[in-house]
Each structure stands twice: as structure tokens, then as C-alpha cells.
Curated annotation (Swiss-Prot):
It comes from Cereibacter sphaeroides (strain ATCC 17025 / ATH 2.4.3) (Rhodobacter sphaeroides). PANTHER family: MITOCHONDRIAL RIBOSOME RECYCLING FACTOR PSEUDO 1, RIBOSOME RECYCLING FACTOR. SUPFAM superfamilies: Ribosome recycling factor, RRF. This is Ribosome-recycling factor. Keywords: Cytoplasm, Protein biosynthesis. GO terms for cellular component: cytosol. Belongs to the RRF family.
């Protein structure tokens, strides 16, 4: 195995760690923080036209005020299905139908709910850390295989240090993202 092969693998390791970070940001985006955001609707799918369709493909989602999300559903026959999907989603928001528009007033979070959300955010962050550590383990396994195939001890140490540096950087990014999200959640 040549060093070029390992460099390609380092790029793959970096991409997989970035993927874990992207997944974490997506999870964080779905947490309701008391502020209006279109991202809280991303996980919602509506039974439309015989299949589960993402809500953002059925209408325009706007945030006109800090505590209000407005959905302008394109097909007026879908309004009741969109409303039902939002109610059944468990995000804790009651939609208000106003003609062709659905308004979602975002209620203020109480202290207990804020603490629950910080725990959920910490759980998501831990899942991302585990995913990153699994990528690190896979990278270290590749290095061990390369050593068995004749890689020099110094090269093995260098590549191991690089994989560890990528891991440390990714874990630090997760910790920073978690700290920011918890601060956002606890902000009144």
C-alpha cells in the first residue's frame, strides 16, 4: 500500500467526520428553541399524492416574525393534510389555518422544557462523537493493515497522529456546536 492510498483514505476519513458534523447540525436544526425557524419543519412529511412528501415541497415557508412561521400551501386541497401532519409531528406547535395560509405561533419555552432540550442536544452531540470515534477506529485499522503490509514504523506513527488530529478537531467542533446550541436554548 503506497502513501498515496493512505492520503486518499485520510480524505475519506475527513469526509466521514464532516458527515457526522453535518448530521449533528441537521439534528440541532430540528430542535425548537423558542425562536421561529423554518428548519423545525424539516423532519415533517405529509401524506400527499399517495406518498410521504417533505413539507417544504408542498408550499412556501417564511418566518415573518421572531415567533411566527407562515406556510403558504400551493395546493389548497392539501391544507388540512399539512395541518394534520404538523399536529401529529410532536413538535409542540398548534397550526392556525387562515384561508390559504397556515400560521405557526411559536410559544415561549418554559425552564423545564429548555432543560429537556439541552439534554436532547447533548444526546445528539454524543451520537456525533461516537460516529467520529468509529471513523477514527476505521482509520486506525487501515493504518494497522498498512503496517502489516510493510509500512515503516515512523510512517505509521505519522498517519496515526494525523488521524488523531482530525478526530480531535472534529470532536472540538461537536463540543463547540453543542455549547452554542445549549446557550441558544437556555436564552430567554
Amino acid at each position: 500500500m503506497s502513501q498515496e492510498d493512505l492520503e486518499i483514505d485520510l480524505d475519506a476519513i475527513q469526509r466521514r467526520m464532516d458527515g457526522a458534523m453535518h448530521a449533528l447540525r441537521t439534528e440541532f436544526g430540528s430542535l425548537r428553541t423558542g425562536r421561529a425557524s423554518a428548519s423545525i419543519l424539516e423532519p415533517i412529511h405529509v401524506d400527499a399524492y399517495g406518498q410521504q412528501t417533505p413539507l417544504n415541497q408542498l408550499g412556501t415557508i417564511n418566518v415573518p416574525e421572531p415567533r411566527m412561521v407562515v406556510i403558504n400551501v400551493w395546493d389548497k386541497g392539501m391544507i388540512s393534510k399539512v395541518e394534520r401532519a404538523i399536529r401529529d409531528s410532536g413538535i409542540g406547535i398548534n397550526p392556525v389555518v387562515d384561508g390559504p395560509i397556515i400560521r405557526l405561533p411559536i410559544p415561549e419555552l418554559n425552564e423545564e422544557r429548555r432543560k429537556e432540550l439541552t439534554k436532547v442536544a447533548a444526546h445528539y452531540a454524543e451520537q456525533a462523537r461516537v460516529a467520529i470515534r468509529n471513523v477514527r477506529r476505521d482509520g486506525m485499522d487501515q493504518i494497522k493493515k498498512a503496517k502489516a503490509a510493510g509500512m515503516a514504523e515512523d510512517d505509521q506513527k505519522m498517519w496515526s497522529d494525523e488521524v488523531q488530529a482530525l478526530t480531535d478537531k472534529a470532536i472540538a467542533a461537536v463540543d463547540k456546536a453543542l455549547e452554542e446550541k445549549q446557550k441558544e436554548i437556555m436564552q430567554v
